């Protein structure tokens, strides 16, 4: 399965909306993914242009969450949220929590933002889906700019880019340097959820997480008793594709010490 962004065809599909076509489905009222297609992954080391806050206190969360109050915080982060399937599930499972999806690809993040807007308008429930939002950013560079020390309760890394080539393993989103940043924004007792269909990447994640002094892996019975665990397999678009193709899932959950 070729996933390294630099090995992919750089050409993306034409955005139908730009050609005057309506990207919104007349049946579901939701944006159609075919108008937002982009290559599978993006180079995290490339010099993308991002606006980002100088410090967490500068983030205007109210612009993303209309109902958030000054004493409330974003506590769940889906890193590399893709097309937002799992992010939507988080919003439904935890209506009292504010969850953010972070995605580096511009068309994909546009899709998630449009999807959330459509869900908010479509839902008849007051406040529905106003607890989820998406940011286009590079989480490998700017995570501490958004979150204060110990702010997050849960972080999710679902089907990240494997960067198969050995020379590019340093680009993997789980590495020793970044694990220290994740530990900084995670509260003690907070959880890191990882899922991949690539066994080599799974072994890499487990090795690096277990070698880091600020994490411990949950026992299998703890993983299976977590109500989020069943959702990790199919809620994301990538996870659903693995299920359709009868592929393997490799799960590991870690606790911040």
From Swiss-Prot:
Belongs to the class I-like SAM-binding methyltransferase superfamily. TrmB family. Residues 1-12 have a biased composition (Acidic residues). Its EC number is 2.1.1.33. The keyword Magnesium does not apply. GO terms for molecular function: tRNA (guanine(46)-N7)-methyltransferase activity; tRNA binding. It catalyses: guanosine(46) in tRNA + S-adenosyl-L-methionine = N(7)-methylguanosine(46) in tRNA + S-adenosyl-L-homocysteine. It is found in: Nucleus. S-adenosyl-L-methionine binds at residues 80, 103-104, 138-139, 158, 236-238. One of its GO terms (cellular component) is nucleus. Catalyzes the formation of N(7)-methylguanine at position 46 (m7G46) in tRNA. It holds the Pfam family Methyltransf_4. Coiled coil: none annotated. Keywords: Methyltransferase, Nucleus, RNA-binding, S-adenosyl-L-methionine, Transferase, tRNA processing, tRNA-binding. Gene3D superfamilies: Vaccinia Virus protein VP39. The active site is at 161. This is tRNA (guanine-N(7)-)-methyltransferase. InterPro entries: SAM-dependent_MTases_sf, Trm8_euk, tRNA_(Gua-N-7)_MeTrfase_Trmb. It comes from the Eukaryota. Pathway: tRNA modification; N(7)-methylguanine-tRNA biosynthesis. It is an enzyme of class 2 (transferase).
